[in-house]
């Protein structure tokens, strides 16, 4: 393990250049270390500890070694100069809040075959200039507040493997288009709250739960299409300016009437097309 004590005791060399042979970068190793503007990780590095580089101000993207398995909680949080992150294919776990409040971060990329299956809680929370995210093909869960208040986030792929989108996961993001994956089961409370650029969203038939306020505050959302009956639909999932497209007599139809939402029936739409 390379620790803060190792760094203090080193003689010569650049701050942030970790000697070969170390597999673990210790918790808080470089916490708020103003001398570190670039980090060079050894090829043997497998784990980056909690808060290891929190508060450092890297001017270059970190070159992660292939073989890195885990980046722990808040490892790179509050780095206000970092612009791009590219993760290695070997990465299996990315800790909560790992890049929280990296407010100049613009691009995040995972290799398609990355082993990372969970996008952890608040991992990119308040990365206010993040515009583009490429998630790995194995992603299954996007946890609570993963992209909370990423207000410039316009482009993100949601792989077909995603089955759960957590509470406030995309709160106040800027996507204009949203293609929900066909195996999605859960849309959490306020998952897309205040995504003000969305205009139309189709809910796949795999979805069993839509949490309250899921699409509330999406002021430009004109249509939300739900052609099946989810097991659970929370209150006020949309604004009253939005139209619910559903099947006549369905649970969704009754839900729309209960909340006074405008409703359009898919059967009538088809009849008009045929006519």
Language-model features: locations:
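Consensus positions within tandem repeat domains that build extended binding/scaffold surfaces
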Residues: 27-29, 49-52, 73-75, 95-98, ...
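A short alpha-helix capping/helix-coil boundary motif
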Residues: 5-6, 53, 99, 124, ...
